[in-house]
């Protein structure tokens, strides 16, 4: 296991081997949808090593048990990934280390006893109409500019379904005008590279205009994710919302409150959110009791003149 970093098999090199092997097997014995998770794990792992160790790669002999704990914290706190995404990244890391040991590139099977975090059992929920209006209308002191920006980013996500990672990276190049003069937001999601397209509501356009700045490349100023979580907590307190408030709820609220309740087909919502599988959208777009009652009333009205024929 001696030798320079150029000649020995290292963590990032082994990660490349695993990712390239998976990519080559797509369509043979691996589905296309499995690759993005590995690809983004590789990007996050490389970023973590550069951030934490100030180098581009590590030898397997340099790894300690603390490494995987620090990587988990980086993915959750710095990158803001959901627990299920972090769990998937950690599982891939363990697989890479297990393969390196099996092939003789590592003297030990690193992280074999590390327990993966439990999958989230709590389904993220959309805001109620009442909570949404409280956040929209809450008065924020002028000196709380960061709170104001956090609230407006949250509202923009409610109106567009844009995730946090995408909201702070979209630029004017992502804005398109259609033949009818309507403005659209089109982008590739950071999480999986899937295309997302959504027509901008007047409320979303107003927020873009509010933060328009020719000297800045992105459409909105950037708030780092740990700060965003802190602002969300403060925003909930200001608005008088007792439940926890997280940015991702805005994406669910777009699916349920803004689009599904307005009669938008779930297939269209899926395209707007950039989902590859409509079953994912079905988790986001939950029918509210209000929507259920309205649909039942429509059904009863439409069938009131029907006669049962036996």
What residue spans do the PLM features occupy?
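Short, aromatic/basic-rich helix-turn unit that serves as a nucleic-acid recognition element
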Residues: 2-42
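C-terminal secondary-structure termini that scaffold catalytic or DNA-interacting sites
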Residues: 299-310
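C-terminal catalytic core of Y-nucleophile DNA break-rejoin enzymes
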Residues: 190-209, 213-234, 246
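Catalytic-site neighborhood detector that most strongly recognizes the C-terminal catalytic loop/helix
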Residues: 126, 189-193, 205, 225, ...
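C-terminal catalytic core of tyrosine-transesterase DNA break-rejoin enzymes
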Residues: 155, 159-166, 234, 251-276, ...
């Amino acid at each position: 296991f001696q030798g320079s970093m150029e000649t020995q098999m290292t963590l990032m090199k082994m990660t490349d081997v695993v990712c390239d092997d998976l990519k080559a097997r797509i369509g043979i014995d691996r589905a296309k949808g499995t690759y993005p998770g590995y690809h983004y794990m590789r990007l996050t792992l490389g970023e973590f090593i550069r951030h934490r160790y100030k180098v581009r790669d590590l030898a397997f002999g340099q790894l300690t048990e603390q490494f995987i704990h620090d990587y988990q914290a980086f993915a959750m706190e710095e990158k803001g990934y959901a627990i299920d995404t972090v769990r998937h990244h950690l599982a891939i890391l363990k697989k890479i280390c297990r393969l390196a040991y099996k092939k003789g590139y590592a003297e030990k099977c690193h992280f074999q006893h590390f327990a993966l975090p439990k999958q989230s059992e709590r389904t993220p929920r959309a805001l109620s109409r009442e909570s949404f209006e409280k956040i929209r209308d809450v008065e924020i002191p002028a000196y709380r500019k960061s709170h104001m920006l956090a609230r407006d980013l949250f509202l923009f996500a409610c109106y567009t379904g844009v995730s946090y990672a995408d909201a702070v990276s979209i630029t004017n190049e992502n804005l398109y005008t259609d033949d009818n003069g309507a403005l659209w937001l089109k982008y590739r999601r950071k999480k999986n590279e899937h295309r997302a397209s959504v027509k901008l509501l007047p409320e979303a356009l107003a927020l873009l205009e509010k933060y328009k700045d020719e000297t800045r490349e992105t459409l909105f100023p950037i708030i780092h994710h740990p700060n965003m979580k802190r602002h969300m907590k403060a925003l909930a307190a200001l608005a008088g919302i007792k439940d926890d408030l997280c940015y991702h709820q805005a994406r669910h609220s777009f699916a349920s409150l803004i689009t599904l309740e307005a009669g938008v087909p779930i297939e269209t919502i899926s395209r707007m959110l950039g989902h590859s599988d409509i079953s994912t959208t079905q988790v986001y777009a939950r029918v509210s009791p209000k929507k259920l009652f309205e649909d039942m009333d429509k059904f009863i009205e439409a069938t009131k003149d029907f006669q049962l024929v036996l």
